[in-house]
A protein has these predicted regions:
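A short alpha-helical cap/connector motif
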Residues: 1-110, 117-138, 142-202
Length: 202
């Protein structure tokens, strides 16, 4: 990863200048360590943005293959450019489409949800069928910049209040989903890790 430091710095700089949300450093560290520790070989990412997290996942393990979905054309094209710059086209496949319109036959060790927060339950339900037995679903932004922990009265924007409500609903959905064992981490912007239970665990 050291030889790609300049390219990674450039991607992070672009994200900052163009207000593209990317994972916090400790969130990325958690994700890449998780991939190494759990010997993840295949990842489906919902929400490519400019390709930062997909690139970091690919660089963490030379054997991991990533499929990533992005619906915003500008971000999708920027991600393509970044992936090409790092010669990772053979390991990262991008799909330009709304994730809810994507149907994939493939199975993955990990599904990583980092897209529209209001749709997290839909993403989980749609793509959990693409998960290998004992696979994982990781979701970013569970704290959403600290707003999830605030009293709703403190949040002035109506749209933001609705979004926070959706994230809270998603958390309850994960806690009550008996097919998965979910743990929540106060790392980065809040991360949840849901492990698909073995039939014997249920």
């Amino acid at each position: 990863m050291v030889e790609h430091l300049n390219e990674i710095k450039e991607i992070k700089k672009y994200a900052l200048e163009n207000k593209v949300p990317i994972m916090m450093d400790d969130g990325i560290d958690f994700l890449t360590t998780f991939i190494i520790k759990n010997q993840i070989k295949s990842v489906l990412e919902i929400g490519t943005a400019i390709g930062y997290s997909a690139i970091m996942m690919a660089l963490s393990n030379p054997y991991v293959m990533i499929t990533s979905i992005e619906r915003d054309e500008v971000r999708y094209l920027e991600a393509l450019k970044n992936i090409k710059k790092l010669n990772l086209e053979d390991r990262i496949t991008l799909i330009f489409k709304d994730a809810l319109d994507v149907k994939l036959p493939d199975k993955f060790d990990l599904v990583f949800i980092d897209a529209a927060k209001s749709q997290s339950i839909h993403f989980f339900e749609q793509f959990s069928r693409n998960l290998n037995n004992n696979g994982f679903i990781i979701t970013d932004n569970m704290d959403f910049h600290g707003y999830v922990k605030k009293d709703e009265k403190e949040i002035k924007s109506r749209n933001l209040r609705q979004l926070v409500r959706k994230i809270k609903e998603y958390r309850v959905y994960l806690e009550e989903n008996s097919d998965y064992q979910t743990e929540f981490y106060t790392i980065g912007d809040g991360i949840s890790v849901s492990r698909k239970k073995d039939k014997l665990d249920i």
